Amino acid sequence: MLAKRIIPCLDVRDGQVVKGVQFRNHEIIGDIVPLAQRYAQEGADELVFYDITASSDGRTVDKSWVERIAQVIDIPFCVAGGIKTIEDAEKLFAFGADKISINSPALADPTLISRLADRFGVQAIVVGIDSWFEQETGKYWVNQYTGDETRTRQTHWQLLDWVKEVQQCGAGEIVLNMMNQDGLRNGYDLAQLKLVRGVCRVPLIASGGAGKMVHFRDAFIEAKVDGALAASVFHKQIIEIGELKSYLVQSAIEIRSE
């Protein structure tokens, strides 16, 4: 059985790490490089960087910080934001990224997933999915352009249909960003994760809602996710990664040890 992964997420805007609640009202957390170094030293298995306004601004990731990150950390990292072409991806890999993640551009053109997977291999291509639970209908919808709240829109895709579609197109991994839970620290949406797990054959990463160590344990044991991504609990040192890993080991969860 593959070890479960603990993945700090760094949302980047204008060269700084920021964090919002339900993808809104972002506050500045700090500079990218020191935070990335801290997480690598604390035992993170990998890092994810989202240039959150790249897609809505119509640009690609600011590459200046990607190269700096690659120079100072020795764990894998994934970069996302406005990647629309093979050339965009090539530049990020050349600067040192281990994986790239696409989200809004894949919704605009699902063939992008296939083209990237064919060129770089499925193991390097992650698809991020921003889901929203609509209480009135009881349906999970996929949202687009969530980095800019003035441009965020609900697509015609229901969540499970899009999960199936991206796998057929060649996604090597899926990060499920559960927008209703984002930043609230009330726990991951286990019901939603279980639904997605039922149709997801590739590694599934939970994102949105971690507030306590038990939330990670529940996602791994109950929803059988492959990794758990979190931001504010790590940024604000509510949870320390080493302590989290020790706790998970005591819960009989296989974790990568240092």
Curated annotation (Swiss-Prot):
Compartments reported by the entry: Cytoplasm
Entry's EC annotation: 4.3.2.10
Record-linked InterPro entries: Aldolase_TIM, His_biosynth, HisF, IGPS_HisA/HisF, RibuloseP-bd_barrel
Pathway assigned in UniProt: Amino-acid biosynthesis; L-histidine biosynthesis; L-histidine from 5-phospho-alpha-D-ribose 1-diphosphate: step 5/9
One GO CC term, this protein: cytoplasm
Main location: cytoplasm
UniProt keyword terms in alphabetical order: Amino-acid biosynthesis, Cytoplasm, Histidine biosynthesis, Lyase
Single GO MF descriptor: lyase activity
Protein's GO biological process: L-histidine biosynthetic process
Enzyme class: lyase
Catalytic activity field: 5-[(5-phospho-1-deoxy-D-ribulos-1-ylimino)methylamino]-1-(5-phospho-beta-D-ribosyl)imidazole-4-carboxamide + L-glutamine = D-erythro-1-(imidazol-4-yl)glycerol 3-phosphate + 5-amino-1-(5-phospho-beta-D-ribosyl)imidazole-4-carboxamide + L-glutamate + H(+)
Position of the signal peptide: none
Active site: D11, D130
Entries under CDD domains matching the protein: HisF (cd04731)
Assembly behavior: Heterodimer of HisH and HisF.
General function of this protein: IGPS catalyzes the conversion of PRFAR and glutamine to IGP, AICAR and glutamate. The HisF subunit catalyzes the cyclization activity that produces IGP and AICAR from PRFAR using the ammonia provided by the HisH subunit.
Family: Belongs to the HisA/HisF family.
Name used for this protein in its record: Imidazole glycerol phosphate synthase subunit HisF
The organism of origin for this protein: Haemophilus influenzae (strain ATCC 51907 / DSM 11121 / KW20 / Rd)
Gene name as annotated: hisF
